């Protein structure tokens, strides 16, 4: 960050972090059509500042001084063309002002910028999701002044931060008589519509009615045919916690606006659940499922979305103990009646009360998803597209709810042969052929690799459905989900082919006869390939391909081995089994090949490796072999 002192020894001019400059430009252009959200964002920040003071004051009540009545004040000045949002919350020190207002100290910043598309509507959603907060001021202001004094410091230790939203800003130490923060917006030309009490109040009631603190403005009265400001305060919002109100008193619009506040999202939520739990533990939960995935969904260390309150006192923002990791997409509020007010993250980790709340919240979200899956398939398909891969993690992480989660999972399959994941395990079982005892699946690193796997040939021939698994997490799923509803899950690429009652006796006998006829060839191929394979055997799972690779029943699949290797994880050194199709012309030819036997054997192994999505140790050698064999064949 560049830094140069100005003539005023107390004032410094600092350069914005590069990402802030980029965000400001994006935001001013992408969000202009929705510019009134600046007030929602600044009120939300003011509310958070008061929550933080309340929390710190639990251990140090002196922070309140003689001002314990927390509130947010909004004022406007038509002559100066300014709007000021004030709070008496925790306030900012000089260093905090530089850190929070001059930089984006957020994980996922890089991912956020790489996700931007240039499409104004899509980028507006992403920017909102990233949390523009304070920077939304610049949508309507060409200069923003922030004066703040942190709770517990002297009046002369306040800070003034000021910027025109271009490349830099200034900070200087100033005097401020009271604790808290004043954000003053100097409006751009053409934004005078916001310099009126009615307009500001309507925005507050639309977006911030649920804020638990009073939002006050000076009352206006009619005098001589115009609105005149009085000295009397009026509270503009309802100023009580939305989640403690009766469900029948809350409109759908109010639920949606509260979600946007709590999740810092611009879009409406997909679904929500609101319940008061009584009995051994008492708490209220208001939990939302967003409509879209955040850009940092795959960061398992990213902030979680549940705010914890104790008896309506804010405790913490991202209480990860309240929701399992595989539900990190859930947003909302939990308000406990039983936890101590001085609860810390360490206490949360060891609290049986928290375990109970977590279990209750998890069951509630799973119930909401089951209801969507049953009664609103279109919404559930939206949910699955956004969060399905994350929900799959729960199969291995949440033993108590494993069956419920398994019932909610959706897969692609050979039933419709499209990449859309819309087949449940119950759907699959409902379509099983008479006599079929297992749920068959294949794993691969892409949908097309799964769909075109040679392992499917016999299944397609017999009309047996196979699940096509190509999400990275799918290997984890099938590693932990070995059966569903009494049916064993079986990889079509592991172990010997066992179709149970679906086997054709004549085919089986033919395969056994071929194994005898090809015994000598199998030994010869195994010797030629050396330590590349564990074994070579005849198969009848292939109808069109000459060969395929399978893993032993208890070895990791080839796809899992590749995933682990790519992640730098150690894997046991297991070798594949090469299976050959005795009906294929290439295999028949090999039986009588002498001069180029090793090349043909290597080719069978290499094309089987490629067909299952593997990589060759020596691609150049493979190409040379192909070319040599093509030349040899064309010369005949």
UniProtKB/Swiss-Prot annotation:
Residue ranges of the region described as A: 1-345
Region (C): 563-636
NCBIfam families: PRK05218.1
Keywords: ATP-binding, Chaperone, Cytoplasm, Nucleotide-binding, Stress response
Subcellular location(s) of the protein: Cytoplasm
InterPro entries tied to this protein: HATPase_C_sf, Heat_shock_protein_90_CS, HSP90_C, Hsp90_fam, Hsp90_N, Ribosomal_Su5_D2-typ_SF
Broad class of the protein's primary localization: cytoplasm
Keyword Glycosyltransferase: no
SMART domains (UniProt xref): HATPase_c
Family listed: Belongs to the heat shock protein 90 family.
Molecular function GO terms recorded: ATP binding; ATP hydrolysis activity; ATP-dependent protein folding chaperone; unfolded protein binding
Cellular component aspect of the GO annotation: cytoplasm
Gene that encodes it: htpG
SUPFAM superfamilies attached to this UniProt entry: ATPase domain of HSP90 chaperone/DNA topoisomerase II/histidine kinase, HSP90 C-terminal domain, Ribosomal protein S5 domain 2-like
PANTHER family, A to Z: HEAT SHOCK PROTEIN 90 FAMILY MEMBER
Quaternary structure, from the entry: Homodimer.
Region feature B, mapped onto this chain: 346-562
Stored HAMAP family: HSP90
Function: Molecular chaperone. Has ATPase activity.
Organism per entry: Dechloromonas aromatica (strain RCB)
Pfam family membership, one: HSP90
Entry annotated with the keyword Lyase: no
Stated name of the protein: Chaperone protein HtpG
């Amino acid at each position: 960050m560049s830094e140069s002192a100005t003539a005023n020894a107390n004032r410094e001019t600092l350069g914005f972090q590069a990402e802030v400059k980029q965000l400001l430009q994006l935001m001013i252009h992408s969000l202009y059509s929705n510019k009134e959200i600046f007030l929602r964002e600044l009120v939300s920040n003011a509310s958070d500042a008061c929550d933080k003071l309340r929390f710190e004051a639990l251990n140090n009540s002196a922070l309140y001084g003689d001002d314990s009545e927390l509130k947010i004040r909004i004022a406007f000045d038509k002559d100066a063309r300014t709007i000021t949002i004030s709070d008496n919350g925790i306030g900012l020190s000089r260093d905090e002002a530089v850190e929070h207002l001059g930089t984006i100290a957020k994980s996922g910043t890089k991912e956020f910028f790489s996700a931007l598309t240039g499409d104004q509507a899509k980028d507006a959603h992403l920017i909102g999701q990233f949390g523009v907060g304070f920077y939304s001021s610049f949508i309507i202001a060409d200069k923003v002044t922030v004066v703040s004094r942190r709770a517990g410091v002297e009046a002369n230790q306040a800070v003034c931060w000021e910027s025109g939203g271009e490349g830099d800003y200034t900070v200087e130490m100033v005097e401020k008589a009271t604790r808290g923060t004043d954000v003053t917006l100097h409006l751009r030309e053409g934004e005078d519509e916001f310099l009126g009490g009615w307009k500001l109040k309507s925005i507050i009631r639309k977006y911030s009615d649920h804020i638990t603190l009073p939002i006050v403005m000076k009352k206006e009265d009619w005098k001589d045919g115009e609105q005149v400001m009085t000295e009397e305060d009026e509270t503009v919002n309802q100023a009580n916690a939305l989640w403690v109100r009766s469900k029948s008193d809350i409109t759908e619009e109010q639920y949606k606006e509260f979600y946007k506040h709590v999740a810092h999202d611009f879009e409406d939520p997909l679904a929500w659940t609101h319940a008061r739990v009584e009995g051994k533990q008492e708490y209220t939960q208001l939990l939302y499922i967003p409509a879209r995935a955040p850009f940092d969904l795959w960061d398992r260390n990213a902030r979680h979305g549940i705010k914890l309150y104790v008896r309506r006192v804010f405790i913490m923002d991202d209480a990860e103990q309240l929701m399992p990791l595989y539900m990190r997409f859930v947003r909302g509020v939990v308000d406990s009646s039983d936890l101590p007010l001085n609860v810390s993250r360490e206490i949360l980790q060891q609290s049986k009360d928290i375990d109970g709340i977590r279990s209750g919240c998890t069951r509630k979200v799973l119930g909401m998803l089951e209801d969507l899956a049953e009664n609103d398939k279109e919404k559930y398909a939206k949910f699955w597209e956004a969060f399905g891969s994350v929900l799959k993690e729960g199969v291995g992480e949440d033993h108590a709810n494993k069956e419920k989660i398994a019932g909610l999972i959706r897969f692609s399959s050979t039933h419709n042969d499209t990449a859309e994941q819309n087949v449940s395990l119950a759907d699959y079982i409902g379509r099983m052929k008479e006599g079929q005892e297992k749920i068959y699946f294949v794993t691969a690193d892409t949908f097309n690799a799964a769909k075109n796997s040679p392992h499917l040939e016999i299944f397609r021939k017999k009309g047996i459905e196979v699940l096509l698994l190509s999400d990275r997490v799918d290997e984890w799923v099938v590693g932990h989900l070995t059966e569903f509803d009494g049916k064993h899950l079986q990889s079509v690429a592991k172990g010997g082919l066992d179709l149970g009652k679906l086997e054709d006796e004549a085919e089986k006998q033919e395969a056994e006869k071929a194994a005898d006829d090809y015994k000598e060839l199998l030994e010869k191929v195994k010797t030629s390939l050396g330590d590349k394979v564990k074994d070579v055997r005849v198969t009848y799972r292939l109808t069109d391909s000459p060969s395929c690779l399978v893993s032993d029943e208890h070895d990791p699949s080839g796809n899992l081995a590749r995933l682990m290797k790519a992640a730098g994880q150690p894997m046991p050194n297991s070798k594949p089994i090469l299976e050959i199709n005795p009906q294929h012309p290439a295999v028949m030819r090999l039986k009588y090949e002498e001069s180029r036997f090793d090349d043909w054997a290597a080719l069978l192994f290499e094309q089987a490796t490629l067909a299952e999505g593997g990589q060759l140790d020596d691609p150049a050698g493979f190409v040379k072999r192909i070319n040599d064999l093509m030349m040899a064949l064309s010369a005949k």
